[in-house]
């Protein structure tokens, strides 16, 4: 039995390796992993079929060698398939990372472009003129009783005078002498201001509604009341808030002064009351001492009482100063005349 120097199975395997290495399609592997696996399976099946046909043609004498060589070829194919799978996986991971990095780069560029669009130069912002305040204010000198701010706003807006931005009403201050109300808790307002978004609307509202009835439903609460309003030319809401703040500060200052005066009067009253109490206590103690002394002296009790009753207090009188044109001699003559007249009368 002769041995061959040239091994056909090994040549087939090496040629297959070379063909596979030379014919590896990277683009197909990037497109789909499943397609590469399918191609590899079909190649392995074809190689197996070719090896089986060669085994049958080689004869029975070479059966053992062909089996061992076929087993080695299968192992090499298996290792080669594992290596290809690993390479495909690594290629897929690399492609995924590349795609992710590209996406992040694109998003970063888009965000930078948006930021540049939204960013305005500082010179334009500084040189930009302020918006003009085109609002108009209408003053209401009198209001219907128990009319609330939102009710006033709705009455004006239903007549087409809108939009209304702000409403301010001054609550009525009841004098302290007025009788106290118990049943009705609704507030009344003396006057008010309404700010319109447009000067034109404010002027038209004041011209059309002034000195007219409120109207509305015939049996309404404010139907017969009359509007009293005037458009304030050149008057802004900031001016109103400034005047209100000034008046509020003045009221608070007056209240503080009145409180300080009341505290001072109260302090003086308490001091006088305490002093009077102290004097009363001293007088009571003196009377008790006097009674004890009189009790010690049996016969002098009545005299002590009379002296206590007839006690007279003496006060030092100030002398009247004479003027420059008057003398003491003139005063004596006047006193003599008065004495003579009084003597004739009495």
Swiss-Prot record:
Biased composition (Acidic residues): 14-29, 52-68
Region (Disordered): 1-133, 281-346
Cellular compartments annotated: Nucleus, Nucleolus
Chief site of localization: nucleus
InterPro entries, alphabetized: ABT1/Esf2, ABT1/ESF2_RRM, Nucleotide-bd_a/b_plait_sf, RBD_domain_sf
Record domain RRM: where: 136-226
Highest taxon of source: Eukaryota
Any single Gene Ontology cellular-component annotation: nucleolus
BP GO annotations: endonucleolytic cleavage in 5'-ETS of tricistronic rRNA transcript (SSU-rRNA, 5.8S rRNA, LSU-rRNA); endonucleolytic cleavage in ITS1 to separate SSU-rRNA from 5.8S rRNA and LSU-rRNA from tricistronic rRNA transcript (SSU-rRNA, 5.8S rRNA, LSU-rRNA); endonucleolytic cleavage to generate mature 5'-end of SSU-rRNA from (SSU-rRNA, 5.8S rRNA, LSU-rRNA); small-subunit processome assembly
Keywords of the record: Nucleus, Ribosome biogenesis, RNA-binding, rRNA processing
CDD domains registered for this protein in UniProt: RRM_ABT1_like
Skewed-composition ranges (Basic and acidic residues): 281-305, 316-328
Any GO molecular function: RNA binding
Function: Involved in the small subunit (SSU) processome assembly and function, and in the 18S rRNA synthesis. Required for the early cleavages at sites A0, A1 and A2.
Record-stated family: Belongs to the ESF2/ABP1 family.
Name of the protein described by the UniProt record: Pre-rRNA-processing protein esf2
Naturally occurring in which organism (per UniProt): Emericella nidulans (strain FGSC A4 / ATCC 38163 / CBS 112.46 / NRRL 194 / M139) (Aspergillus nidulans)
Gene name linked to the record: esf2
């Amino acid at each position: 039995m002769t041995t061959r120097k040239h091994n056909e199975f090994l040549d087939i395997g090496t040629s297959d390796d070379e063909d596979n290495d030379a014919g590896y399609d990277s683009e197909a592997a990037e497109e789909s992993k499943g397609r590469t696996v399918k191609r590899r399976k079909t190649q392995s099946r074809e190689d197996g079929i070719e090896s089986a046909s060669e085994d049958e043609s080689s004869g029975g004498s070479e059966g053992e060698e062909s089996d061992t060589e076929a087993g080695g070829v299968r192992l090499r194919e298996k290792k080669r398939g594992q290596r290809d799978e690993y390479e495909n996986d690594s290629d897929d991971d690399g492609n995924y990372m590349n795609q992710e990095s590209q996406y992040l780069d694109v998003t970063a560029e888009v965000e930078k472009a948006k930021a540049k669009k939204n960013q305005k130069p500082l010179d334009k912002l500084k040189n930009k003129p302020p918006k003009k305040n085109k609002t108009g204010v209408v003053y209401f000198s009198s209001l219907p009783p128990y009319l609330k701010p939102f009710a006033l706003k709705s009455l004006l807006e239903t007549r087409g005078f809108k939009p209304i931005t702000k409403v301010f009403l001054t609550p009525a201050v009841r004098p302290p002498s007025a009788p106290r109300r118990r049943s009705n808790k609704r507030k009344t307002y003396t006057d008010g201001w309404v700010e319109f978004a447009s000067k034109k609307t404010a002027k038209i509202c004041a011209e059309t509604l002034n000195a007219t009835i409120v109207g509305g439903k015939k049996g309404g609460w404010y139907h017969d009341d009359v509007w009293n309003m005037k458009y304030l030319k050149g008057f802004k809401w900031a001016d109103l808030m400034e005047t209100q703040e000034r008046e509020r500060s003045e009221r608070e200052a007056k209240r503080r002064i009145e409180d300080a005066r009341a505290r001072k009067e109260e302090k003086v009253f308490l001091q006088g009351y305490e002093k009077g109490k102290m004097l009363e206590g001293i007088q009571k103690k003196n009377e008790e001492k006097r009674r004890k002394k009189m009790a010690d002296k049996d016969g002098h009790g009545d005299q002590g009482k009379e002296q206590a009753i007839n006690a007279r207090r003496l006060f030092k009188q100030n002398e009247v100063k004479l003027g420059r044109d008057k003398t003491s001699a003139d005063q004596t003559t006047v006193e003599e005349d008065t004495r003579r007249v009084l003597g004739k009368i009495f």
